[in-house]
Amino acid sequence: MAAVVQQNDLVFEFASNVMEDERQLGDPAIFPAVIVEHVPGADILNSYAGLACVEEPNDMITESSLDVAEEEIIDDDDDDITLTVEASCHDGDETIETIEAAEALLNMDSPGPMLDEKRINNNIFSSPEDDMVVAPVTHVSVTLDGIPEVMETQQVQEKYADSPGASSPEQPKRKKGRKTKPPRPDSPATTPNISVKKKNKDGKGNTIYLWEFLLALLQDKATCPKYIKWTQREKGIFKLVDSKAVSRLWGKHKNKPDMNYETMGRALRYYYQRGILAKVEGQRLVYQFKEMPKDLIYINDEDPSSSIESSDPSLSSSATSNRNQTSRSRVSSSPGVKGGATTVLKPGNSKAAKPKDPVEVAQPSEVLRTVQPTQSPYPTQLFRTVHVVQPVQAVPEGEAARTSTMQDETLNSSVQSIRTIQAPTQVPVVVSPRNQQLHTVTLQTVPLTTVIASTDPSAGTGSQKFILQAIPSSQPMTVLKENVMLQSQKAGSPPSIVLGPAQVQQVLTSNVQTICNGTVSVASSPSFSATAPVVTFSPRSSQLVAHPPGTVITSVIKTQETKTLTQEVEKKESEDHLKENTEKTEQQPQPYVMVVSSSNGFTSQVAMKQNELLEPNSF
């Protein structure tokens, strides 16, 4: 008797020749070994259930075709009972032999109705789809001692390997998103066309809040002075100049064309509770940011250009301190000239020429704007010139030494600018005849903080000159001017160089490249004569005046008629080099050579610009 069930049902196969009563069926000694397995081709076995196998081949059951084959012979009184236990076959060539062996087992009668019911249920509930399911083959063996042995073998079916679509997972369906509505066109007359860029906030999306929107408007040139502006920038107080326009901009950003100030005001009141904004009491449409973010772009009302300022108080107060220092550094003209003291700033230290009259001095890095004289009938131009101010000489009323600041709007566009030249403080200059030893003249530059303003250059003051003091030096020199004639006014007086306006311009302007770029090594000797030659550059024909110690060279405002362009220098004099008891010897006019030493770091990258128009925003 043989019965076949599908998948997880047990299959009992046994053979017997003598089964007469139920006692023998219930006795476990009659069935020494039982195999329980899953048959892969159950539908084929069911179709062959009614066929009879007449002859069996001799090699139907062999060790080569079966994985496990056990044979047990039990001696009985009547016949010998032979029980064959098979395992599943794994070779494709022996499948037919396995089917024939199964047919022989199916032809036997069933000893009981229980297995027949399982067979009927299997035929009813089985389907072709169930046949496709691959289940592991389980071998259960029961020995005579009652010890069960279980072995499970995985079986792969070719149908599943051939179908790639079964293993591939199903593709997820696309979710239908909500279509965004196109924005409604706004009238350019009622709603300004202002676009606010959205900022990504660490993956939180592109949502921009109302307070961020207001900050963006405050940093936009098209909206800041017109629709919204700062009233107290340091405290974060701003005012909605045109509340309707701001609300329309917010509605355009939120795609709500019916937005008004009342609706936007409710959102602003929500920020009161959050501690972001506050309403300034007593002022309409004025609000305050509780915390100001850093690196805001502030729009200046007077200047259309914007400047990035930090909210750090130390940095934001730098501009205010500079303005205060500039206002404190105003020098009165009348007491300074009558007292005989002229304020001159040095780059190294901030000391006046005479400490008897203390004056508050600004930093050398500041550039002060020069007030135009009211008596000037034409625009005044600033040139790089030098002017000698006598300490004991009274200045007429026409001249006034003043330094002040003025607004950018009041500056005339024709006013020339004064550029600070990054040069060393000591510029040695050598004046010596060709056949004599060289002597150096040290000049010191003057910062552009004190400007002597003259209304009429032809007023009765001394001529404009350079005073160069000779000191010894043994350093490399740069040729400044050759064939300079020294003329002596009288016997015993220091020789002076007298040049016309064209010669002064040629010396001090055409030789700028020579001073900045080229250096010529000239042998010099530390020894020099007792008479220190004083070089005087006279722009126009006027009487030369002897200058006692303490003479100061500063800059002066020249008119358009004057063509002399020079550097602003300050003469550094030493009383040890000026001897009153000079030898009374007549000196013949002979050519001199003027050279400039580059020993004190006189860089070749000095850029000297002249006649540059002063822009209102240059300061």
From Swiss-Prot:
SMART domains: ETS. InterPro entries: Ets_dom, ETS_fam, TF_Elf_N, WH-like_DNA-bd_sf, WH_DNA-bd_sf. The keyword Cell membrane does not apply. Pfam families: Elf-1_N, Ets. It is found in: Nucleus. Residues 305-321 have a biased composition (Low complexity). Residues 173-182 have a biased composition (Basic residues). The modification Phosphoserine is found at S110, S163, S167, S168, S187, S432. The modification Phosphothreonine is found at T190. Residues 568-586 have a biased composition (Basic and acidic residues). PROSITE patterns: ETS_DOMAIN_1, ETS_DOMAIN_2, ETS_DOMAIN_3. Residues 322-335 have a biased composition (Polar residues). GO terms for cellular component: chromatin; nucleoplasm; nucleus. Keywords: Activator, DNA-binding, Nucleus, Phosphoprotein, Transcription, Transcription regulation. Transcription factor that activates the LYN and BLK promoters. Appears to be required for the T-cell-receptor-mediated trans activation of HIV-2 gene expression. Binds specifically to two purine-rich motifs in the HIV-2 enhancer. Belongs to the ETS family. This is ETS-related transcription factor Elf-1.
